[in-house]
Amino acid sequence: MKIKQITTLLLFTFLSLPLAAQVYLDSAEVARFLPYKNKVVTTTQNALEQDSISSDDETDDEVDSTLTAFDYDTHLSWKENITQRLNNIFQSPLLQTVQAGVMIWDLTDDTLLFQHNEQLHLRPASTMKCVTAIAALDKLGSSYTYKTSLYYTGNLVDSTQTLEGDLYIVGGMDPMFRATEMNQLVAAIKNLGINHITGTLYADLSFKDSKQFGRGWCWDDKNPTLTPLLYNKKDIFVEQFNQKLRQNGITIDSGYGTRQYPSNAQNIITTTHSIGDVMRHMMKASDNLYAESMFYQLASNGGINKHASANNARIYIQQLIRKLGLNPSNYKIADGSGLSLYNYLTAELEVKLLRYAYQNPDIYNTLLPTLPIAGVDGTLRKRMRNTPAARNVKAKTGTVVGVTSLAGYLTAANGHLICFSIINNGGLASGAMRNFQNKICIALCQ
């Protein structure tokens, strides 16, 4: 049979399908028989962009392939059209084997738009980071900074360029601490005219407790180490600092150890990073260490709680949940990143948190720019491209085995601002769950 005849037959088959089948056909299949100019073409992101999200826990790099179009019935209101579209999406056979908790809220009208199993307890994966981010901003404020401080005790002897005393490096669990900040510490010591230290280099680890991993983390995951002193996101700070001092001609007689700095210690320098800068990478790249660091900033409450624990953070999150009019005992908060298998939230909780953030400009104006943008950046860079949802949906993704989630904001076709949460559990293929979520977003945007 000639190619032209095959093409004609396939097109006839496609056009003969029921409307719902036409709407939800996979574009990879449609592209086989559409004219060449209509094929879906995808491009590989450059190496720099890939590196920028190298710590991403959304490990599935599969590109979207859903070709979605929706009719608009002029005899129905916008809300009735949206409800009809969403009801059709929820006829998907996917939901025969996969759980879905969904809530969609119209922020402009401050009314419920759609809900489905919104109170079903589900594992959120990395949309847990939305909970952590909003709780941290609510408790600490948008001007909060992560700190790493250097102190000394004893006497400075100018004639011998000696510190007759000790150095203390006080950790604040700053995940952005890199070589630039390390060099600043060394330069500050040199500026004091110190080339020799008769005492000890102490690491003050009192910012948090000694637990290095979160509850419910799988042993075979790429788990971050939870330490107050981080260098290049690793637990190698003191060794690297000691080495850097030696390289710059600064010697220490008694090596290094751990001890909390005394109240009479003198500050040499403090390096800082803003909560907004940390949050941007945490959300765009879905960085688990950054999220756990923010979880412990919340737990520490700006340094008020020494040896802060995950339970301290949970208490503050529970307080926020009560402010939303919900019962915190209905949820399980294990960690700040969503890595834990013990986290159980609902779509309702996530939406009410996003609504709360929107109603508080200090939170919303810091949170919104950190969210991945559909078809543009972060973990949404390959999703919903060439659709009305592209450059519109700003949302946090979540992916662990069996779980895919999406929560954030979008502007609907009627100009209304929407917040939403979609949590899928029990799926063997994350791509199918992502496409389900994409269709919901496109239905709202188109």
Q: What is the role of each PLM region?
A:
Residues T97-Q99, N117-Q119, A125-M128, S143-T145, ...:
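Extracytoplasmic
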